[in-house]
Amino acid sequence: MRFFKFSTSFLLTILSTVLLVLQSCSPNNVTLQNNYKKYFDDAALTGSFGLFDNGSGEFYIYNLAQFKDSSYAPASTFEIVNALVGIETGRIVDEKMMLSVDSAGPIRMDSAFKQTSVPYFMEVARRIGKDTMQQWLDSLQYGSKQMGTAVDSFWLNNTLTVRPDEQLGLVKKLYFGQLPFQKRSQEMVKMLMLQTANANYKMSYKTGLNYKQNGNAVVWIIGWIEENKHPYFFVLQTEGAASSDIKNASMSLLNKILKEQGFFEGKR
């Protein structure tokens, strides 16, 4: 298996670069966006938001303490890592690979990713196996790196947790092909994350929804928006009373923030 061929020096290099986004974050290049509280309040949500302008090196952050210090289960945003490991190890052949995982019948990998088919990626994780998955979590230094005993649910049951700033580092490295996976693996997952493409912008993201022990719902939206071939990376994490509309409310909140930042018109 290709993973075991990594040299120690290569793994150390990857380890040292995973935190580049955070290490470059200093008081001089962070703008605190406290005015975004109005959008969270209007949606009856709490949480944090971070935007990184790759061109200028500037961060725009709402609720900095929570953004860099609070951890949550990644929920279905972990499908980014799950897909990367699956492709890299050959457990996922390509985006057309079909699996029958529930009564709905066979589903393709690309559709499973777009539609957030939890059963599909639970099966992928089982095929990858606990030891191999753990080795990749360690190599990526992804979140708490904890799996527990269940290889097919650790990203859903709060065993594995991750901070918003770590999620930002993940999508940034994916965009630039800087994760310890082959180019093919990263390009395939990047393609799957594309949600909107028009003359003004391209927007790529993955969502996740999970529930805390207190009954509250936690939503993630992580990815990037491109205007004039320039990428901006974002992470939104929200929390609120569980409802069928919380994911839509979080997406609306994200769009309002991005619009205030001047996106969607192709002028950035």
Residue locations for each model-derived region?
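Beta-lactamase-like hydrolase cores
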Residues: C25-K68
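Mid-domain, small-residue-enriched loop/turn segments at the edges of structured enzyme/sensor domains
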Residues: E123-F176
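Active-site SXXK
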Residues: S71-D94, A112, F234
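Structured C-terminal helix/loop/strand segments within mature extracytoplasmic catalytic/sensor domains
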Residues: S26-Y39, A43, R126-G129, Y175-N200, ...
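Solvent-exposed coil/turn segments that connect beta secondary-structure elements
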Residues: N54-S56, F67, T89-R91, Y142, ...
